[in-house]
Amino acid sequence: MARWCALAGLVGGLALAAPAAAHDTDRLPACKTGKASTKPPTTRASDSSPEACASAAPAPGLGRAGAAATPAGYHHLGAGTTNAWAGVTGRLAVVDSAVRRNTYDFVASRFMVKRDTGKGRIAWLEAGWAETGWAGNGRQLIYTFNTNTNQWQFYAQYQLKPGDRIWLDLHTDGNNVWQAWLWWNNRWNLLTSQRLPIGASAYVEQYVEIHVDEAKAARLTLPSVTVDNVQLRPAGGGRNRYWREDVATQTGNTSPQRTGGFCLKWVTHFDTWTAGDCPKPR
């Protein structure tokens, strides 16, 4: 699926995201300001997990792009499942990239759940962190994107910094409702809950993406981003399982990414890996 659709959605005459749609989660307390967790999650993400809370609505005024960008400027590094799952969880490292302000440059590290709904349409929900040329003034931001709103949603309450490692969880408990959660301040923070025409299972992606503004072509640099502890939630229930070689997986052609100067290294197929600038030849 072309990730450029998301950037096009940002600029289709829409302002920054309206509050994320909540379904059966209004009873969650508001999340308090805190810091990135240094300990891994102790329970599955759920509105019934201990001290679960709901994030504030995405903050207005972070800015928006003003014209569509060409998909030719994209580089994708990662993998996707070829079977459907009920969710995905994992940890993403935050880095400071060379994204230029007031451009359509962006770097994003994210998980996605998606399904083809026919007639060329795809429904999806994604969550991760991003550094963009149009929002955040050079900061890295937690974000979500879904095909109900077709908008990037930035969560300014979470003060990220390079070196942070953040846990994210995307899953469904049924009824076509898919949720994105962030493990922050040692509790699960609900980012968004969306009723999507995906069903009880979806295809899963894990990617680091780089987009270079085609109107202002330049070479971007990307310090190595680590993705690890990636686990899949089985459709129909059961314990999470690590995304390993026994999971039917599709990876893209790495040649175009190397041409752009970006390399992917699998530490363990497919739950631990790095992506970033290719090593300089000696």
Give each language-model segment a name:
Residues 23-282:
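Exposed, interaction-prone regions of secreted/extracellular proteins
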Residues 1-24:
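Secretory targeting and sorting signals
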